[in-house]
Amino acid sequence: MRIALATCLDMPRPDADLPILVEAFAARGARAEVVPWEDPRAEWGAFDAVLVRSTWNYVGRYRDFHAWIDRVAAATRLVNPRAALLWNLHKRYLAELAAAGIAVVPTGVVLHGTEPDWEALFARHGDLVVKPAVSAGSFATIRVRRGDVAAARAHREAHLERDLLVQPLLASVVSHGETNLVHFGGRFSHAVHKGARWDGDAEQSRGLVTPAADELALAQSVLAHVGSAGFGPLAYARVDMARGADGRPLLMELEIVEPSLFLDRAPGAADRLVEVVLGAV
């Protein structure tokens, strides 16, 4: 069996998950090959499945990446499924999850070419987090201190062609960081603690943690909604959360396109993912 691990040509940083996955697939008798998604020579239909991994440069080639998803899904099995990937590319999904009753960090979407009322946003939320609605990693994600309208407008101007997200900066993110819960086949695998990350920062995993019961419950409610929406079973998902002012966990992002899975931190995790992928092919 041949499995493609989709990555990208101009990697912003090494993907530590890739060699671990190649070895884990080999242990199950499958051949995993690392293939850049934008490689015009790639014959996707020759693979039994394409597992989306570190396609991190799609942010600057959104339409091309959308077309690639369509093309691969028509040629072979795409993991995660096409519908789930397309839904997750634009972070408007956070508003949908909030409307469904999921505890989500308050999120406003600023459509491309428009300017929000920054003064009102600062008055409502204090310090802000501003980032593109289509992004990977910490691309163009900044903290804007309360009242710094000039900085907010400058960032808006620099990314005028993009939809942006505006969220309050959670105090817990600054003081403690966030918790990322990794799931394979809808089941919890492992969790890591990460520090705050801004534009240009590297991933800052601080090691494995045991999530609290309310964090596990939030992650399950998020994944249950995705399942009920008909997006098909998810081979992998990373549910990122932090605690709000009242101490409750709040969803920050649901990563089902190209999340780092921190397989090097969790012995056996790669085997669990491989089992799910091979079981679906």
Regions found by a protein language model. Give the residues of each.
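Conserved N-proximal alpha/beta basic substrate-recognition cap immediately N-terminal to
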Residues: R2, L9-T107, L111
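Active-site nucleotide/adenylate-binding loops and adjacent lid/helix of ATP-dependent enzymes
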Residues: I3-T7, I69-A75, V79-H176, T210, ...
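A short beta-turn/loop motif at secondary-structure boundaries
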Residues: R41-E43, S135, L170-V174, A242-A245
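A short beta-strand motif that forms the metal-chelation/ATP-contact edge
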Residues: F47-V52, N180-H183, R248-S260
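Anionic group-transfer/hydrolysis microenvironments
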Residues: T55, A133, L169-L170, V182, ...
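Glycine-rich phosphate/pyrophosphate-binding beta-alpha loops
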Residues: W56, S138, R197-W198, E255-R265
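Phosphate-binding site of ATP-dependent enzymes
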Residues: I142-A229, A242, L250
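ATP-dependent carboxylate activation and anion-phosphoryl transfer catalytic cores
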Residues: A213-V281
